[in-house]
């Protein structure tokens, strides 16, 4: 998805599309939907150059083909990556013999908090056709909250209970509440944002989320095999930052449909 979004932006630029408009800092106005992201091992050397340009940034590493928060960790120093390379025997510096690919994204260190906790949105999307693109959004998605209050302290970088919203992670914590599962419906979250941020700001935020979903699917429209007898269902994970800007974090091709609380049913 990341590579296709980047390619789609370049295609729009070549077409002089207004969707590819940039601001005075060179950032996309309408297509700035994903954090700065690299795919390892292929992008490792490029990432090292960028890391040295932003030595104080935090990055989040995720294995491409795992689920439930497994294998995710934060990186603030190159030595962490090099040590991890040696321990896991994954030679990023070349494409020989690595076990699995990883996605490395710039960590959004200032998320919007509710009750001091970080959260993200899980939105279910049904695509019945890619050509033409026909998309349906399920109204009853939900917000998932971290089980512990958020802290940007460097000493808390390894505490996944404040950084990850995955239920499988949260259940390992004694504070996990199995009645509500640390979840709100999206309708409840939107109502909360209307009350705390204003109705106009909340509506703008959710309009931008809809745009993220549409742009993401347009980006892969040309590479997904279209079969009128089939459909695709995706789980979009979106994080809202402190400025009420939504960011695409993940697109899950096989989202879990298991239920743990009434909100899921």
Regions found by a protein language model. Name each.
Residues 75, 264-265:
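Short, conserved loop/turn and helix-capping segments at secondary-structure boundaries
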Residues 252-260:
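Glycine-rich phosphate/pyrophosphate-binding beta-alpha loops
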Residues 46, 50-233, 242-247, 252:
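Catalytic core of tubulin tyrosine ligase-like
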Residues 62, 262-263:
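Short, solvent-exposed loop/turn segments at secondary-structure boundaries
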Residues 206, 263-264:
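Short, charged, low-complexity patches
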Residues 18-31, 227-236, 265:
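Short amphipathic alpha-helical segments embedded in low-complexity Lys/Glu-rich regions
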Residues 1-60, 65-67, 74-87:
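Conserved N-proximal alpha/beta basic substrate-recognition cap immediately N-terminal to
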């Amino acid at each position: 998805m990341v590579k296709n979004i980047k390619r789609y932006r370049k295609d729009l630029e070549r077409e002089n599309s207004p969707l590819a408009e940039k601001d005075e800092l060179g950032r996309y106005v309408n297509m700035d939907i994903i954090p700065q992201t690299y795919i390892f091992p292929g992008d490792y050397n490029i990432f090292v150059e960028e890391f040295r340009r932003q030595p104080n940034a935090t990055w989040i590493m995720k294995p491409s083909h795992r689920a439930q928060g497994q294998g995710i960790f934060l990186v603030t120093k190159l030595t962490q990556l090099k040590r991890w390379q040696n321990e896991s025997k994954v030679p990023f510096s070349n494409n020989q013999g690595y076990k699995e690919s990883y996605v490395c994204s710039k960590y959004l260190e200032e998320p919007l908090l509710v009750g001091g906790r970080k959260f993200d949105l899980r939105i279910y999307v049904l695509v019945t056709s890619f050509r033409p693109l026909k998309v349906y959004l399920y109204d009853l998605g939900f917000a998932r909250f971290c089980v512990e209050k958020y802290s940007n302290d460097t000493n808390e970088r390894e505490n996944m209970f404040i950084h990850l919203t995955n239920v499988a992670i949260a259940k390992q914590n004694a504070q996990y509440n199995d009645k509500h599962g640390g979840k709100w419906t999206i309708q409840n979250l939107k109502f909360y944002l209307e009350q705390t941020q204003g109705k106009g700001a909340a509506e703008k935020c959710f309009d931008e989320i809809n745009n993220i979903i549409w742009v993401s699917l347009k980006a892969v429209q040309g590479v997904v095999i279209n079969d009128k007898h089939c459909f695709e269902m995706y789980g979009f994970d979106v994080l809202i930052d402190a400025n009420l800007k939504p960011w695409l974090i993940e697109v899950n091709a096989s989202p879990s449909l298991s239920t743990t609380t009434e909100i899921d049913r």
